From Swiss-Prot:
Name of the protein in question: Uncharacterized HTH-type transcriptional regulator YijO
Any one Gene Ontology molecular-function term assigned to this protein's record: DNA-binding transcription factor activity
Source organism: Escherichia coli (strain K12)
Keywords: DNA-binding, Transcription, Transcription regulation
SUPFAM superfamilies per record: Homeodomain-like
InterPro entries on file: Homeodomain-like_sf, HTH_AraC, HTH_AraC-typ_CS, Tscrpt_reg_AraC-type_HTH
Pfam families in the cross-refs: HTH_18
HTH araC/xylS-type domain span: 172-270
DNA-binding region per UniProt: 189-210, 237-260
Record flagged with keyword Transcription regulation: yes
Amino acid sequence: MYHDVSYLLSRLINGPLSLRQIYFASSNGPVPDLAYQVDFPRLEIVLEGEFVDTGAGATLVPGDVLYVPAGGWNFPQWQAPATTFSVLFGKQQLGFSVVQWDGKQYQNLAKQHVARRGPRIGSFLLQTLNEMQMQPQEQQTARLIVASLLSHCRDLLGSQIQTASRSQALFEAIRDYIDERYASALTRESVAQAFYISPNYLSHLFQKTGAIGFNEYLNHTRLEHAKTLLKGYDLKVKEVAHACGFVDSNYFCRLFRKNTERSPSEYRRQYHSQLTEKPTTPE
């Protein structure tokens, strides 16, 4: 098999290497000593052979995809030769690797990186895939999301990296600043001061470059982290709110319901009830 990254992406998106079952790795419970665990989300795709993965609780065969959320883990048990294609979604770049287990040792067949630039298409697709963990039986939808994510990866590989304009570069720097400090008491004024610009220019920058308001982006970032805490930790709603930068837990609950049509407690219960449902067989 030819192991060029762009070639593999095209074959997975358009065939003949069609996507089969989408599995979701564990993000709860004790992590085995030899398990793979990183702080960024990733996809593990089987190209050839098969193996048992403890994190997925299943035997993966060619075309199967294992989605490992940020902080999640997987633990492949190699019993026969197999080849996998991994995509790591780092904050600043994507990492691609093709690894083969020949029965005795690992061999790296391909490795490539590309910068994550421009609109946050990949980030929103990953958020959608995180939500799919609540409904793993919806396999057709999960396959379409993964295919879209792989298509986005191929677009990044195929595009010419252009130097960002000054306003675009500033917007991305501010966005990263918010992503790292969302739990702090951020305001439009404090963020503007950190970058030596006026609050009005900050608002203009978000509307023009990001097509989203500053407060809207800040709240969205905090709510996404709140969802992660609600799903993975047994914290009180008030503790989740404060951990994500919301001073007023009542405001957090109103905002959460407005964005999800569920209260934080309902969201947590639905997530855990979905996890207990047995996934259906591949369509």
